[in-house]
UniProtKB/Swiss-Prot annotation:
The complex is comprised of an extracytoplasmic solute-binding protein and a heteromeric permease formed by two transmembrane proteins. The keyword Repeat does not apply. Belongs to the bacterial solute-binding protein 7 family. PANTHER family: DICARBOXYLATE-BINDING PERIPLASMIC PROTEIN (PTHR33376:SF2), PTHR33376. It is found in: Periplasm. D-galacturonate binds at H39, E78, R94, R154, R174, V175, Q176, Y197, N214, S218, E241. D-glucuronate binds at H39, E78, R94, R154, R174, V175, Q176, Y197, N214, S218, E241. This is Solute-binding protein Bpro_3107. GO terms for biological process: transmembrane transport. Residues 1-30 form the signal peptide. Disulfide bonds join C104-C138. One of its GO terms (cellular component) is outer membrane-bounded periplasmic space. GO terms for molecular function: carbohydrate binding.
């Protein structure tokens, strides 16, 4: 199990520092914003992208604003950093949309299984009005949705091949802490097991879980490939990452500085995508070199059981409209 005491201390220290800084924030005061990320690698695409955003923001603000990225779960799990951002104890966090599902319901739309036909389709959909509407919808929950980052296609990795949906039956598969993700994996006949990202490696090693589902770069950089060697390309979701800012912090800034932050975030998207494509190719080579087997699957068998997931979660007119808009995007 992960030793949580140092992390909790770090979270409390970060929260105190943020609150003290917020008390004295003035229009002319230089600010070093803090942003969280759970990935270990300092050059992981999302980590690098927020660092790049910080460089852009520093230039746009004439050195007034900077961003320091705390990755490796230094400020907590994705759920913990979301909680900090909501109360203004942390400025930014980069998380997968999964942990935002309950807080900002429209983020469930891009999480839905087999919604996107390709990475290009996902990018085009989220670059347009659909993505803008989903980001905007987070404001009522206390978050400024700034950008979507690529997270590739998520697939199942285990000690054995998962070639059809029947092969997943009964497996304990780690999922994100989201009701939608529990339902998605349960629809396969598996036992969905919510677990923080930082605990997956130990869970796989000890047999607490049989499998996990994620993209190739995470399979590689989180060293999950050391624990299990079979990556079955279910590609059941292309759920993106989302970069959010605390609305409490954002609302204290002048309009011109708010616009700088939004512009820097948007400009970082193309950078992240380039890094993502490079990392995905590199990670695929890495896991193959580590002895991983990449397995093609019968995707139709997985798609066939996902109807109830849509029925359960795509319940509002807005959700249904956005799903159709994605499906109609060419």
């Amino acid at each position: 199990m992960t030793n949580r005491t140092p992390r909790i201390s770090a979270i409390r220290s970060a929260a105190l520092a943020a609150l003290l800084a917020g008390l004295g924030m003035g229009a002319a005061q230089a600010t070093e914003f803090r942003s969280a990320d759970t990935h270990n690698a300092d050059d992981y695409p999302t980590v690098a992208a927020v660092k790049y955003m910080g460089e852009l923001l520093e230039k746009k603000s004439g050195g007034k604003h900077k961003i320091k990225v705390f990755n490796k779960q230094a400020l907590g799990s994705e759920k913990e950093t979301i909680d900090q951002v909501k109360i203004g104890a942390l400025d930014f966090t980069r998380v997968n949309v999964g942990p935002m599902n309950a807080i900002c319901p429209l983020t469930q739309v891009p999480t839905m299984p087999f919604l996107f036909s390709s990475i290009a389709h996902m990018r085009k959909s989220l670059d347009g009005p659909v993505g803008d509407e989903i980001l905007k919808s987070c404001e009522s929950a206390g978050f400024i949705g700034l950008a979507f980052y690529d997270s590739g296609a998520r697939s199942i990795y285990a000690k054995k091949p998962i070639r059809t949906v029947a092969d997943a039956k009964g497996l304990k598969i780690r999922v994100q802490q989201s009701d939608l993700w529990v339902a998605l994996v349960s629809a396969m006949g598996a036992n969905a097991t919510p677990m923080p990202y930082g605990e997956v490696y130990t869970g796989l090693k000890t047999g607490l879980i049989d499998a996990a589902e994620n993209n190739i770069p995470s399979f590689d950089t989180a060293k999950h490939v050391e624990a299990v060697k079979v990556y079955s390309k279910t590609e059941h979701s292309m759920a993106p990452e989302i970069l959010v800012m605390s609305k409490i912090i954002y609302d204290k800034l002048p309009k011109a500085e708010q616009d700088m932050i939004r512009a820097a975030a948007k400009e970082s998207v193309a950078f992240e995508r380039q890094k993502w494509d490079e990392q995905e190719a590199k990670s695929l080579a890495n896991v193959k070199a580590a002895g991983a087997e990449i397995v093609e699957v019968d995707k139709k068998s997985f798609q066939a059981v996902m109807g109830p997931v849509y029925d359960k979660f795509m319940t509002t007119p807005d959700m249904k409209r956005l799903v159709k808009a994605v499906q109609d995007t060419k």
